[in-house]
């Protein structure tokens, strides 16, 4: 099973992990809806919906760049309608867009709290709700419908909350969407899963966090390859929904034990661990 001719609606796909997932799918000849906010280049965060579209086309896919703020319900509904008008439907939703602030309660103003929850938890829920009618059609037509959310396994351990309670709440909100929607959408034949990296991933956003050694990170392509495995699995198989995958575990389970090619620094074995993975 591959992604040729499938349409993927990917949020936050103008750069980083979202773009890597888009390009991996494009290599099969997929249609990619690039739903992201950045339409003009910013030297601090290179990449726009238009530059991403060029990369997707160069990789072998079709691209529809759409400027979308996933906090805006009407903007999301309009983007879904445009995707359907352009490609005839939506087979896969990838909830990748996310906001982060690693601040404690005293240093997290409500504006920042609302931003994280608006993008992470609410945005994931909204995009899933908006795409659901098309995903149901795709599943009914045997097109292997999937929802994949880039969020961590749920853990109630205090050390994952205390340093950045607001961020954890927002990120776990995405994971709770996976938990609930996997059960809710099972009857439609739509698989719903989460995927999370074991290590820090070298993205432009990560490099803006002070003190991060990018040389001790892995590349976004490890998540792209792991996502591909999820999205090409049989959505109607009960074992393939409701999972909280860790990238290297999933790859190893599919026989990909040598992960050195994903290291920013080849040969490195000491990576920065990501949040929420014990």
Residue map of PLM features:
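Conserved glycine-rich cofactor-binding loop
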Residues: 14-15
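Conserved glycine-rich Rossmann-like NAD(P)H-binding loop of the short-chain dehydrogenase/reductase
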Residues: 28-51
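The beta1-alpha1 cofactor-binding region of Rossmann-like NAD(H)/NADP(H)-dependent oxidoreductases
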Residues: 47, 67-79, 110
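Substrate-binding pocket helix/loop in short-chain dehydrogenase/reductase
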Residues: 104-105, 109-114
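A short, exposed helix-loop element centered on a Lys and neighboring polar residues
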Residues: 128-129, 179
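Catalytic loop of short-chain dehydrogenase/reductase
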Residues: 136-187, 196-201, 212
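C-terminal helical subdomain
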Residues: 194-195, 211-278
């Amino acid at each position: 099973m591959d992604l040729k001719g499938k349409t993927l609606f990917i949020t936050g796909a103008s750069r980083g992990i979202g773009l890597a997932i888009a390009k991996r799918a494009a290599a099969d000849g997929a249609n990619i809806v690039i739903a992201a906010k950045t339409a003009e280049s910013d030297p601090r965060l290179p990449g726009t919906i238009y530059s991403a579209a060029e990369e997707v086309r160069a990789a072998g896919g079709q691209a529809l760049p759409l400027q979308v703020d996933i906090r805006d319900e009407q903007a999301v509904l309009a983007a879904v309608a445009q995707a359907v008008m352009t490609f005839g439907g939506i087979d896969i939703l990838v909830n990748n867009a996310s906001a982060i602030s690693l601040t404690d309660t005293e240093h997290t103003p409500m504006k920042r709290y609302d931003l994280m929850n608006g993008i992470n938890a609410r945005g994931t829920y909204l995009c899933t709700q908006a795409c659901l009618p098309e995903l149901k059609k795709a599943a009914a037509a045997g097109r292997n419908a999937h929802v994949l959310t880039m969020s961590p396994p749920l853990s109630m351990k205090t050390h994952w909350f205390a340093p950045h309670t607001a961020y954890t709440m927002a990120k776990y909100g995405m994971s709770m969407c996976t938990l609930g929607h996997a059960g809710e959408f099972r009857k439609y034949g739509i698989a719903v899963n989460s995927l999370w990296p074991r290590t820090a991933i070298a993205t432009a956003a990560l490099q803006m966090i002070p003190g991060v050694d990018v040389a001790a990170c892995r590349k976004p392509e490890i998540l792209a390859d792991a996502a591909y495995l999820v999205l090409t699995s049989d959505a109607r198989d009960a074992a393939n929904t409701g999972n909280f995958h860790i990238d290297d575990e999933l790859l190893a389970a599919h026989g990909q034990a040598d992960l050195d090619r994903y290291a920013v620094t080849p040969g490195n074995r000491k990576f920065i661990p990501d949040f929420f993975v014990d």
